[in-house]
UniProtKB/Swiss-Prot annotation:
Pathway: Glycolipid metabolism; diglucosyl-diacylglycerol biosynthesis
Organism: Bacillus subtilis (strain 168)
Gene transcribed to yield this protein: yngB
Matches recorded under PANTHER family: UTP--GLUCOSE-1-PHOSPHATE URIDYLYLTRANSFERASE (PTHR43197:SF1)
Reaction catalysed by this enzyme: alpha-D-glucose 1-phosphate + UTP + H(+) = UDP-alpha-D-glucose + diphosphate
SUPFAM superfamilies in the record: Nucleotide-diphospho-sugar transferases
The name this protein goes by in its record: UTP--glucose-1-phosphate uridylyltransferase YngB
Signal peptide: 1-27
Length: 297
């Protein structure tokens, strides 16, 4: 009987240099998107997908991530004393999202190495990997979409979306022989190809379901691009021996790995909040009018 996906890994050891100076003294994963730190959206997606245990791969100066997902007796006492029961309940729910564990990636040797750090936590079970630079908003959680495919095929599954031809060099791109509905069979993966070399315009979007056999592959592939251990290289090795599937993700994806993407995510997620929507729309309309008037001068 095929094992269910119960565990997830969230790599969060990066330095966040694109967001300096904001990340000089705090992790980029803790930067707010409206009123939640970015990593909370990722943890919530995992929990809503049915994940029970989450391992966050951290590094130096990441202690605030652990504090965020822990209980805070002082804060809870303060909220209780002030009668802020709804806020108190919300804070307590953060600590109860899942069983969250932590381990440090002692060297910045790439995504594949970060995944390899989770080997003892995962054991011989299938598991999910969620990258913190991609926030997905969808009716069915993005990870759940992948897990449903895994339940059918039992193979590695990657989450994908179509991108513009000029953007293929930013992503891992799949080579596929065809699809059944939203599911592709993957023949190969190419990491950040030029538009001329790209086998398709279907890009990997930071969500994976992997079998534990990936660990032995990661140990043998050696270092790839950037002198780092690349997860894409390991998946290419798997492709040569057995099928891999890709799930075309339904929903909106927000790339918060750069400043503009982070701003877009905050704006659009803010528009989804009923208490903010009308005022935010009015503000954006006013900005557009002012900027348009300025441009026409």
């Amino acid at each position: 009987m095929r094992k269910k996906v119960r565990k997830a890994v969230i790599p969060a050891a990066g330095l966040g240099t694109r967001f300096l100076p904001a990340t000089k003294a705090q992790p980029k994963e803790m930067l707010p998107i409206v009123d939640k730190p970015a990593i909370q959206y990722i943890v919530e997606e995992a929990a809503e997908s049915g994940i029970e245990d989450i391992l966050i791969i951290t590094g130096r100066n990441k202690r605030s991530i652990e504090d965020h997902f822990d209980r805070s007796a002082e804060l809870e006492f303060n909220l209780r004393e002030k009668g802020k029961t709804e806020t108190l309940k919300e804070m307590q729910q953060i600590a109860d999202l899942a069983n969250i564990h932590y381990i440090r990636q002692k060297e910045p040797l790439g995504l594949g190495h970060a995944v390899l750090c989770a080997e003892h936590f995962i054991g011989d079970e299938p598991f999910a990997v969620l990258l913190g630079d991609d926030i997905m908003v969808s009716e069915t959680p993005a990870l759940r979409q992948l897990m449903d495919v895994y339940d059918v095929y039992g193979t590695e599954v990657v989450g994908v979306q179509s991108v513009l031809p000029e953007d293929v060099s930013k992503y891992g791109i799949i080579n596929t022989s065809g699809s059944q509905g939203h599911v592709y069979e993957v023949n190969d993966l190419v990491e950040k190809p030029s538009p001329e070399e790209a086998p398709s315009e279907i890009a990997v979007m930071g969500r994976y379901v992997l079998n534990s056999s990936i660990f032995s592959v990661l140990k043998t592939i050696g270092r790839g691009a950037g002198n780092e251990i690349q997860l894409t290289d390991a998946l290419r090795e798997v492709c040569r021996k057995e099928p891999i599937h890709a799930r075309l993700l339904e929903g909106n994806r927000y790339d918060i790995g750069d400043k503009l993407g982070c701003f877009k995510a905050s704006t659009e997620i803010g528009l989804m909040r009923p208490e903010m929507r009308s005022q935010l729309l009015a503000y954006l309309e006013d900005v557009i009018k002012r900027e348009t008037k300025e441009m026409l001068r």
